[in-house]
């Protein structure tokens, strides 16, 4: 659902920022 999409998007952003 939308929540899953947002969760994945946030996870990608967090990984990008942490790297």
Curated annotation (Swiss-Prot):
User: Which biological processes are named by the entry's GO terms?
Assistant: defense response to bacterium
Can you tell which superkingdom this protein's organism belongs to? Answer: Eukaryota
- Annotated Gene Ontology cellular component terms: extracellular region
Tissue note: Expressed by the skin glands.
Which keywords does this chain's UniProt record carry?
Answer: Amidation, Amphibian defense peptide, Antibiotic, Antimicrobial, Secreted
Keyword Acetylation in record? no
Keyword Secreted carried by entry: yes
- Quote the subcellular location field of this record: Secreted
Per the record, the major location class is secreted
Q: Give residues where Serine amide occurs.
A: 19
Biological role stated in the UniProt entry: Has antibacterial activity against the Gram-positive bacteria L.lactis (MIC=25 uM) and S.uberis (MIC=50 uM). Lacks antibacterial activity against the Gram-negative bacteria E.cloacae and E.coli, and against the Gram-positive bacteria B.cereus, E.faecalis, L.innocua, M.luteus, S.aureus and S.epidermidis. Inhibits the formation of NO by neuronal nitric oxide synthase with an IC(50) of 2.4 uM.
Designated name of the protein: Deserticolin-1
Source taxonomy lineage? Eukaryota, Metazoa, Chordata, Craniata, Vertebrata
């Amino acid at each position: 659902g939308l929540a899953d999409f947002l969760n994945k998007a946030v996870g990608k952003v967090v990984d990008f920022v942490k790297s």
